[in-house]
Each structure stands twice: as C-alpha cells, then as structure tokens.
Amino acid sequence: MPTVSGSENKTIAGFMFNWVKDNCNLPTDFTYNFNFTSTGSSISFVPEKSIGIYEWDVCGNYEAEFPFSIIIGVSATDDASRMKPYIIFDTIVEKLDEVTAKIWDYNSGFSINIDSTKTVLKIEQISTPVVIRQGEDNSIDVQSLFKLYYEKEVH
C-alpha cells in the first residue's frame, strides 16, 4: 500500500490527537500525551504507522487510512479504578460512532474537514481495549487501536 508524505502524516496525526481530545468528552483531570505514555492518569495518542492510500481515482484524488492507538493509564487501586479506562473507551467509541453516522447521513450535510483538501470519511475502533502494562504500583495502561479513513481532493 503506498503511503503519504511525512508532512501529511504529521498533519493528520496532530488533527486526530486534538480532535479526540476536544470532542470525545474525556476527563479533564487526565494528562494528555502525543506519541508517548506517562505515569498517573493519562491518555496517550500514538500513531501506529504511516498513512496508507487504499484507493485512487483518475483525477489523483485518493482515500487513505491512518491507524492509531489510544492508551489510557490509571492508578488501579480497586475494581472501579481498573474499569475507568474501559468506561473512557466506551465514551470515545460512542462519539466516534455518532460522528460517523452523521457523516454517512448525506442529508445531514455534516462533515469534518481536516483542512481544505482532506475530509474525514469514518473513524472506528478496530480492536477491543487490552491491558498492555501493569506496574508494581498497581498502575495499568490499557490500549485500543483505531483507524481514521479520509479522502483527499487534489485541486
């Protein structure tokens, strides 16, 4: 699968980080990180690999996919705190499903523009959340994979 330029990768990654942070009703008492995880209550956005182009048209327009992870870290001192990442992921997925439904309802006129040439087609969760780290201090990191699909129009 062909990939896009490094600058387009940066644009898309930065857009998605800020969009998820600003639009998914996430907790305000968490630290937000781009491309790294930290200790304590944190939500990290990690691009998984380069954006892949999966469809071209005769004019040079294309559709591409951007895989990314969200990693939620908490101090898990009891069952309720161990469940917090999963509840946050549910909130994120509900918002993504709602937005994707609006995008695909052509009568709504709703769209998310990344910039003047790129428009979001769909954002979806592609894996269930899993614990990827458990610290000796009872902290845990829970990760889920997502994918943004977008189209770029060549002007």
For every predicted segment, state its role.
Residues 1-35, 51-155:
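Charged, amphipathic alpha-helical segments and their flanking helix caps
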Residues 40-51:
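Charged, often glycine-rich, active-site loop that binds/positions anionic groups
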